[in-house]
């Protein structure tokens, strides 16, 4: 299996993504998704569209700092490409261990210590299809944001406009600004 760090294409991000109270409560959770495709996806094209996608989500290619925020430093997201040429799509669908066998690797402890990105991707090319797996830190995105990210990736890959993610954290109160009664 070959793993490459994918970084934001174009302008380099900066700043930090601060964890809200709710984000902190979700730091021990991982959101996982897996998609099956007929036909073999082009790994190079998927990486290229993913790099463009990260421009909309720069915090996902950063690293946690002091457990309070993600530094948007463009360290990159691990993107693994694997081959399973003897496995057919119809076999993969029936495998009880498919999520483990084809799932992206995500080290939750490494993420919380700033050694892993908040997101990881694995693309496994089968004999007649492809399995795409994403694992992400729930503290950096909720379910809606996770699935919107995947939808936006598909849109970018097909050359369509994306659904602009909401990233204005000023709307959320930070723990330091809350009074004891709140």
Where are these predicted regions, by residue range?
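Non-catalytic N-terminal regions of enzymes
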Residues: 1-182
